[in-house]
């Protein structure tokens, strides 16, 4: 089991070697350039992750994507052209656990306040938080710059998107030993395999009905295997905490 963060130097070096394949995220296709306006790239010259713009000055990501000297790129499609993007720095970061001692199955969430707001544009727009939890069986969208092949990773350089299903949590418990009976995560994937979030997609969104329902957290060492779904932090369970922090209540606590 691995967190789906990526060594970004490797990603950048491999951009020109990406393969054209119908098995492109793994099992996806290149996103429409206007489809991922909320998606952001977190990068510090060593590691890369994704995040999601949820209003003009706040980004939601995974706490395991926290890194020093990070820059936040908005409006990016092709990573080789990221210097044409809007660039922001984190002004403040907020975690559910002050020591960031998260577990694989709980509280892998980070809220970042940008040093200055961004304007909505053709390529940049915030994504709404969920109004209710997604139902099992819902078809949701994943996206990112992560590997499109696994276990020998190939990175595409441009954003890829795919559809997956919200699966019963029992499917994830059957796939990964030691999970608790309940968790503030969503189990997502395709039971037959072939499609799924992969190395480099960490922190990115799981989008259902136009709302941000999940944050890419962790999955199997080899991506998109049958009966090996990915775990996504369940954003709905943290909406009160998120909204309280944004409103200025920095002492707000996460759900237990």
Swiss-Prot record:
Glycans are attached at residues 44, 78, 101, 152. Expressed by the venom gland. Monomer. Its EC number is 3.4.21.-. Residues 19-24 form a propeptide. GO terms for cellular component: extracellular region; secretory granule. Keywords: Disulfide bond, Fibrinogenolytic toxin, Glycoprotein, Hemostasis impairing toxin, Hydrolase, Protease, Secreted, Serine protease, Signal, Toxin, Zymogen. GO terms for molecular function: serine-type endopeptidase activity; toxin activity. Pfam families: Trypsin. Disulfide bonds join 31-161, 49-65, 96-254, 140-208, 172-187, 198-223. This is Beta-fibrinogenase-like. Its main location: secreted. It comes from Daboia siamensis (Eastern Russel's viper). InterPro entries: Peptidase_S1_PA, Peptidase_S1_PA_chymotrypsin, Peptidase_S1A, Trypsin_dom, TRYPSIN_SER. The active site is at residues 64, 108, 202. It is found in: Secreted. Residues 1-18 form the signal peptide. Snake venom serine protease that has fibrinogenolytic activities by hydrolyzing the beta chain of fibrinogen (FGB). Typical arginine esterase which hydrolyzes esters and amides of arginine. Residues 25-247 form the Peptidase S1 domain. Transmembrane segments: none annotated. Belongs to the peptidase S1 family. Snake venom subfamily. GO terms for biological process: proteolysis.
């Amino acid at each position: 089991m691995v967190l789906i963060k990526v060594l970004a130097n490797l990603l950048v070096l491999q951009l020109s070697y990406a393969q054209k394949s119908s098995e492109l995220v793994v099992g996806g296709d290149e996103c429409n350039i206007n489809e991922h306006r909320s998606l952001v790239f977190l990068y510090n010259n060593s590691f890369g992750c994704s995040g999601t713009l949820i209003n003009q000055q706040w980004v939601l990501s995974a706490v395991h994507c926290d890194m020093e000297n990070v820059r936040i790129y908005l409006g990016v499609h092709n990573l080789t052209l990221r210097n044409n993007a809007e660039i922001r720095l984190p002004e403040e970061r907020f975690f559910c656990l002050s020591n960031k001692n998260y577990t694989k199955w709980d509280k892998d969430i980070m809220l970042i306040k940008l040093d200055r707001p961004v304007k909505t544009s053709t390529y940049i727009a915030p994504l709404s938080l969920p109004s209710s939890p997604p139902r099992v069986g819902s078809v949701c969208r994943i996206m990112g710059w992560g590997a499109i092949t696994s276990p020998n990773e190939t990175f595409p350089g441009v954003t890829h998107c795919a559809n997956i299903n919200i699966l019963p949590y029992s499917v994830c418990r059957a796939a990964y030993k030691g999970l608790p009976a309940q968790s503030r995560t969503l189990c997502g994937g395709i039971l037959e395999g072939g499609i799924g979030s992969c190395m480099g997609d960490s922190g990115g969104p799981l989008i259902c009905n136009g709302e941000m329902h999940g944050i890419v957290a962790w999955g199997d060492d080899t991506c998109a295997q049958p009966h090996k779904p990915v775990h996504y932090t369940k954003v709905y369970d943290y909406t009160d905490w998120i909204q309280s922090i944004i409103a200025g209540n920095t002492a707000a606590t996460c759900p237990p």
